[in-house]
């Protein structure tokens, strides 16, 4: 994958970091704005790539907050020190998928980058899991104590 499709980022204090390698740039992958109350409150702009890879590094595991709500099948990864939400993680056995909050890219996308509003409230658990497996980025590494 080209360096142009590599995005590095993390929380404000550096406790949570990641490397997202996409098969395409944001002009192809796009940005989404979920309309749930959590994402609206955080003004999230997320992206993912089922053909890409995600590597997540947690320096101090005790400062990683995993927040669950709604259907309770996804961990929203938040730094307990600085309060930044870096993305959502869905795990199943030894596999995991991630959608990343592009606002935590270094540098983040321009404020005027097009964002597609999305609403998944009508999905039941099987439909939501299937969509995420189809569309979210596979996690290649999730390292605690990095």
Roles of regions detected by a PLM:
Residues 1-10, 15-146:
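A short Gly-Trp-Pro
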């Amino acid at each position: 994958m080209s360096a142009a499709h590599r995005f590095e980022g993390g929380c404000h204090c550096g406790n949570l970091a990641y490397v997202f390698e996409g098969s395409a740039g944001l002009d192809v992958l796009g940005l989404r704005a979920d309309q749930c109350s959590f994402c609206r409150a955080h003004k999230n702009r997320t992206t993912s790539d089922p053909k890409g890879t995600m590597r997540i590094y947690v320096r101090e595991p005790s400062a990683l907050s995993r927040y669950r709500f709604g259907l309770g099948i996804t961990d929203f990864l938040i730094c307990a020190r600085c309060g930044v939400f870096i993305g959502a993680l869905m795990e199943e056995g030894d596999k995991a998928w991630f959608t990343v909050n592009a606002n935590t890219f270094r540098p983040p996308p321009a404020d005027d980058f097009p964002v597609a509003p999305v609403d998944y409230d009508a999905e039941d658990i099987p439909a939501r899991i299937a969509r995420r497996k189809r569309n979210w980025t596979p996690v290649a590494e999730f390292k605690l104590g990095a």
